[in-house]
Amino acid sequence: MRTEKLLLIGPMGAGKSTIGKILAQELNWPYFDNDTELSQLSGLSAEALGEMPVAELHVLEALCFKEILSRPAPFIAGVAGSVIDKEEHRELIRGEFAIYLRLPLAEIIERAGYSGIGRQFTRVADDSQIRERFTRRDPLYGACAQLTIDLSSSAEADAQAIVKALNVGEISAQG
């Protein structure tokens, strides 16, 4: 299978940005970070996006996702966690090579923090709401992914596991 668009999917705080940058360096492909691209597309600062109502932010995230997908390959992109919620977006994800960066719920809560783009939800949600979101989205991420990586404590090791999967023929990453 040949792919030239790698989509990193998973919850907020999974490490899409960190792992995406490492993969970009390893593969010599551009990396499109959701937060950076969202800020550029909207013309809003990260701080302004971080204060935006969640529903409005999700609309912008969907527009950003579609805009990134329209770009020429090859590239790696970190996809906003909310994009998985709509079937039309899941269909687009399934059309590319998606890598699910999976981690346990406790790690999601710990990593997500309470500030930054998309973190509005964590400021107002209790653990049961975060658990509900995880329970709802986890199978959706898994169903859309062609490769799932159970994350370790090292982003470098996780990126190397992805590169190894690319190199052993699970997918072709030659651009």
Language-model region placement:
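NTP-dependent small-molecule kinase module
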Residues: 1-2, 18, 22, 26, ...
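Hydrophobic anchor at the beta1->P-loop junction of P-loop NTPases
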Residues: 8
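P-loop (Walker A) phosphate-binding loop of NTP-binding proteins
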Residues: 11
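Conserved glycine(s) of the Walker
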Residues: 15
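Post-Walker A helix-loop "phosphate-sensing" segment adjacent to the P-loop in P-loop NTPases
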Residues: 25-34
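ATP-dependent small-molecule kinase phosphotransfer cores
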Residues: 33-92, 118
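Short glycine-rich anion-binding loops that position phosphate/pyrophosphate groups of nucleotides
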Residues: 80-84, 104-106, 154
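A glycine- and Lys/Arg-enriched "phosphate-lid" helix/loop adjacent to the NTP-binding pocket
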Residues: 95-140
